[in-house]
Every structure is written in C-alpha cells, then in structure tokens.
Design a protein with these regions (language model features):
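Residue-level signature of catalytic and energy-coupling elements of molecular machines
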Residues: 4, 65, 110, 192
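Ordered, amphipathic secondary-structure segments that act as subunit-interaction surfaces
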Residues: 51-70, 76-78, 101
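Long, charge-patterned amphipathic alpha-helical coiled-coil/hairpin "stalk" segments used as oligomerization
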Residues: 70-175
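Structural signal for hydrophobic packing residues in well-ordered secondary-structure cores
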Residues: 5-16, 30, 131-138, 171-178
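Flexible glycine-/small-residue-rich
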Residues: 24-26, 57, 95, 153-155, ...
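Translation machinery proteins
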Residues: 2-63, 84, 90
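Flexible, glycine/charged-enriched surface loops at secondary-structure junctions
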Residues: 16-20, 177-189
Length: 204
C-alpha cells in the first residue's frame, strides 16, 4: 500500500490538487439483495474538502442542523429548490418525519447517490452528529452493478502517510462488512487513482 501511494504521488505535477479515489472489485453477486455492500465511515484524515450538507428537518432538529454547520436546512421550500434544479450539495440528510417530502425527490437524488437512507445513516433524528461527521470527511459508498465500490480517500497534497492511513481504514472497513452469503474471494482487486492519473494496483 505504501509503495502504491508513493507511485501515485509521482504523478502529482498538475496545477490543481487532484482528488484521490479507491476502487475495489468484490467477489459478490450484485443482483442478490443479501450481497449488497454499502456503508459509510469517517476517514482518519478527512478527504481534503468540506462537504456541502443539506438537511430536511423542522423545529428543534432544524435548529440543531443549522448549529452543526449544515449549508441549507428546510422542508417544502428545500424540496422546491431541488425540483427547480438546485443540486449544489454533496450530502442530503433527512429526519424520518421528512421522508414524505423527500421521497418524491428520488428520481433527482437517487441517480446522483444523494438520496437519504436509513442504512447509510442519512435518515436520522441525530442530525447534528451526522452533519458534523460528513463535514469532517465521512464517505459513503455502495457497490455498483459491476461489483465495485468507489470512494474519495483524500487529495494529492496529503502526506503519503495520511493517504495510507485513509486507504487502509477504508479497506479494513469494507472487509469488516463482508456479507455472510459471500463465498470464495471477497476482495478481488484494489486500485487507487487521482483525477488525472492512471490507476495503481494495490495488493489485496
């Protein structure tokens, strides 16, 4: 892993700070509901940017979300902004009583991976904690149809040690949520890359 990060950092001569991603190919059958791999974790060193977080909530929960640093908080009026084409955010959180308002936005939010979900922890009554976690660098992922999971793990400007810590934490977390029904090799391959670089394989 250390070698892979050092190889990747040799490509860093671009004028902007490239985002570093991890791609893991899994030995799962994505058509089976009991083999879906999804989750979220706060990386030890963040991801190098403050994520823009919006929250669907009312009353006290709305106040808590605002105090925690949410970029936008609301209900019907927030839904209308999204329906009108506003999607300038990275994370969408909702309190459970707001799902009646959020549900119809699924066609807009779902394809972008922004739909709040109880399994991902983005449908919650503890909105303040979740807002703080995402602003601190929490990443969320779900396997795609090709049995891959992808996530941002930092920036090229990070020290190699910090990238290694983030990538190691992500791999360990993915290993820890292996579905019980998966037989054979679970992690088939791991690669890291940045915005403008080739992929570098990591030994699984």
């Amino acid at each position: 892993l250390q070698q892979a990060v050092e190889v990747l950092k040799q490509f860093s001569g671009r004028k902007f700070d490239q985002t570093v991603e991890i791609h893991i190919n899994l030995g799962i059958d994505p058509a089976q509901n009991d083999q879906i791999v999804r989750g979220s974790l706060v990386l030890p060193n963040g991801i190098g940017k403050t994520q823009r977080v919006i929250v669907f909530a009312k009353g006290d929960l709305a106040k808590e979300a605002e105090q925690a640093g949410a970029d936008a908080v609301g209900a019907e009026e927030l839904s209308k902004r999204i329906k009108d084409g506003w999607l300038d955010f990275d994370v969408c959180i909702a309190s459970p009583d707001m799902m009646g308002i959020v549900g119809p936005l699924g066609k807009l939010l779902g394809p972008r991976g922004l739909m709040p979900s109880p399994r991902a922890g983005t449908v919650t009554t503890d909105v303040a904690r979740v807002v703080k976690e995402y602003r601190a660098g929490k990443v969320e992922f779900r396997n795609d149809k090709g049995s891959n999971v992808h996530a941002v793990v930092g920036k090229m400007s990070f020290d190699a040690t910090k990238l290694v810590e983030n990538i190691g934490a992500f791999i360990s977390y993915v290993q820890s949520i292996k579905p019980n029904s998966v037989k054979g090799t679970y992690i088939k391959s791991i690669a890291i890359c940045a915005t403008m670089t080739p992929s570098v394989r990591v030994s699984a």
